[in-house]
Amino acid sequence: MVTVAALALAPSAGADDHRHAYDAMIAAAARANGVPEALVHRVIVRESRYQPRLIGQGGVYGLMQIKLATARSLGYRGDTTGLLDPETNLAYGVKYLAGAWRMADGNEDRAVRYYARGYNENHLRLHSPRPGAPRSLLPAPAAP
C-alpha cells in the first residue's frame, strides 16, 4: 500500500523531467549572454516544451525553435540538423534572445514577444536610413 501511495505521488514525465536534463547548458548559455535563466526556460517552455528534436512550422528547430537563417545571421555555419543539438540550439537561440532582451530594456514579457515574432526585422525597420533603402543587418545594442 505504501508503494501504491508513493507511485501516486510521483511526478509524471513531462516538460519538468526534460527541463532538468538541460539546466546546466541553459545556465551556461544564459550567463554567457547576460540574460536571466528563468527567461530562457520561459522561452523553451513556450517554444518546444523541452523537446530538442522538435521541428516546427515555418522551419524552426530545436529547444528554442530558431530558424536556420536567424542562426546563420549570428554566425552559425551548420545545417538544420545541427540546430537539433541542444547545446548548439541554445548557443544561437540564447544569443538571439539576448538581443530581444536588450531591445525590451529587460522586460521579460516584451523580450518573449520580440523573440517569438522576430525582433531583427522590427529593429531594421525602425533604423532604416530612409524608406526603400537597402537594409543591412544592424548589430544589437551593446549590453550595459
Model-derived features with residue positions:
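Solvent-exposed, polar/charged alpha-helical surfaces in well-ordered, non-transmembrane soluble domains
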Residues: 20, 24-28, 37-41, 68, ...
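A short, structured beta-strand-centered segment in the mid-to-C-terminal lobe
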Residues: 81-88
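Compositionally biased, proline/threonine/alanine/serine-rich low-complexity intrinsically disordered stretches
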Residues: 9, 15, 19-20, 77, ...
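Bacterial N-terminal signal peptides
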Residues: 1-8
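Solvent-exposed loop/turn segments at secondary-structure junctions
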Residues: 48-51, 70-73, 118-121
